[in-house]
Regions:
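HhH-family (HhH-GPD) DNA N-glycosylase catalytic core used in base-excision repair
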Residues: 1-474
């Protein structure tokens, strides 16, 4: 599914500063040389001076620099990239996961099953920017986060953000932000007396679009938490989710907060702990053994917490169904969480919570320095391939690459490979497709066909509405 937004709707969104469209498109002003998010608080430009772009990278490629007031590089990504199963959607998910930084455009093309020239042509034709420009925009954003939230030396930040040289880093920052790295750091809004050191972790604001039902996500994570790699602590409404992460260059530990100062009581009453975030972010802190993993770690957290979803489109569609309408009205912004590690989730979906804890205790790599109850990494597929039966077969398929569940995997191919494994039932396969592959349009076996068709293309969200029962409803 592709959001087709006509020019009149776009300009009206800019004129009314409509945050619902942040990340769905960007606009640039010819007379100022600046590009913005639709909700930018600056004076509305004349229609004749406005240009529209599908991505920040396209605006940058056209010579526009990021607005310092609205920081368009910090908005949630378009929900289309989660929905779409075509080459452009898959490419955008992989670029977000850092594939171009690690493997270059040839590596991206191999993963997509196309030539590098075909990938360049398709992305440029639709998005106005090729894979290099898209990755460059992402590197610039990562660098800004590190410059403005840590006291790391500029040289370390350049390589941590994925730049090949300090000169390339300096040139990109000047082009995108019209500031030197030092000036960009000095322009950071102050949230305290001093920036944290790397040992204290990197503070993050994980932006989301529209209302966000944080309590439902944290309820699910608490129910699923596996001893040794995850924990959820604190009172409901003010919980902290913590987990270990296996990343391309090293390991990480993240803490994500449920509470947010912009939270509001859910419609229809309910306690203050059943908060709906009304647009904004989740606060997080990330500890990494290798800072080159920052971009990948952030993208995996965004998928786990479903932060790039479009709750307005989801709620409009599902709210038209009589069965779901009262649930949607009472729970705006309900999300369909994904997975921080798709391979890990597939194994957990198969063996269950207790089985996963057993695998962690037996095969998991022990952290060099335990952090409270977080003591292990979940075992890599190769470490589990000797397990008997279906778990071993699943692990072997993941390890040898015959089954791919990464951000850019073809969902239909992955489902076919899962179904070919002995002992995986249809419900487990559907759950893996929904959570590990991040498919927003999955129906579990047993739902009435007519109802399921009415929920397209958001069937995964419909199932979350039907499955989740907050304590007051139980």
């Amino acid at each position: 599914m592709v959001h087709v937004i006509d020019e009149e709707t776009r300009y009206e969104a800019v004129r009314s500063r409509d945050a619902r469209f942040d990340g769905e498109f960007f606009f640039a002003v010819r007379t100022t040389g600046i590009y913005c998010r639709p909700s930018c608080p600056a004076v509305t430009p004349k229609r004749t001076n406005v240009r529209y772009y599908a991505t920040a990278a396209a605006a940058q490629t056209s010579g526009f620099r990021a607005c310092r007031r609205c920081r368009p590089d910090a908005v949630p990504g378009s929900a289309d990239w989660n929905v779409r199963a075509d080459v452009v959607g898959r490419a955008m998910r992989m670029i977000g996961d850092g594939v171009v930084d690690r493997e270059g455009v040839p590596g991206l093309a191999v993963r997509l099953g196309y030539s590098a020239r075909q990938v360049q042509r398709q992305l440029t034709a639709e998005l106005g920017a090729g894979p290099v420009a898209l990755a460059r925009a992402q590197r610039a954003h990562t660098a800004r986060v590190l410059l403005q939230t840590t006291d790391l030396p500029v040289t370390e930040i350049a390589f941590a953000a994925g730049f090949a040289s300090v000169r390339q880093f300096n040139d990109t920052i000047k082009t995108v932000y019209a500031l030197t790295p030092t000036a960009l750091r000095a322009a950071a809004p102050r949230r305290g007396t001093a920036r944290p050191t790397p040992a204290a972790g990197i503070p993050l604001r994980l932006a989301h679009r529209g209302p966000y039902r944080a309590d439902a996500v944290f309820d699910l994570l608490a129910d699923e938490a596996v001893t040794g790699i995850e924990e959820v602590g604190g009172e409901r409404g003010a919980r902290t989710y913590r987990r270990t992460l296996r990343l391309p260059y090293g390991t990480g530990i993240v803490a994500v907060e449920e509470a947010h100062h912009d939270s509001a009581t859910a419609p229809g009453g309910g306690s203050s702990t059943e908060a709906v975030h009304r647009g904004g972010w989740l606060d997080a802190r990330l500890h990494l053994t290798d800072l080159r993993d920052l971009t990948t770690a952030v993208q995996r957290l965004r998928r786990l917490f479903d932060l790039d979803a479009d709750p307005y489109a989801v709620d409009e569609r599902l709210g038209a169904d009589p069965r779901l309408a009262p649930l949607v009205a009472a729970r705006p912004g309900l999300r369909s969480p994904g997975a921080a590690d798709p391979d890990e989730f597939a194994m957990r979906a198969l063996v269950g919570r207790a089985g996963a804890a057993r695998l962690v205790a037996r095969y998991g790599k022990v952290l060099d320095a335990a952090c409270g109850t977080l003591t292990h990494l979940f075992p890599a597929p190769a470490d589990l391939a000797a397990e008997p039966g279906t778990p071993g077969a699943l692990a072997a398929a993941l390890a040898d690459g015959s089954l791919r569940l990464d951000a850019g995997a073809d969902r239909d191919d992955a489902e076919a490979a899962l179904r070919a494994l002995p002992g995986l039932d249809a419900r487990t396969v559907a759950l893996i497709r929904m959570r590990a592959l991040g498919d927003p349009d999955v129906a579990l076996p047993g739902e009435p066909e007519a109802a399921v068709d009415a929920w397209r293309p958001w069937r995964s969200y419909a199932l979350r509405h039907l499955a989740w029962r907050p304590p007051a409803d139980s």
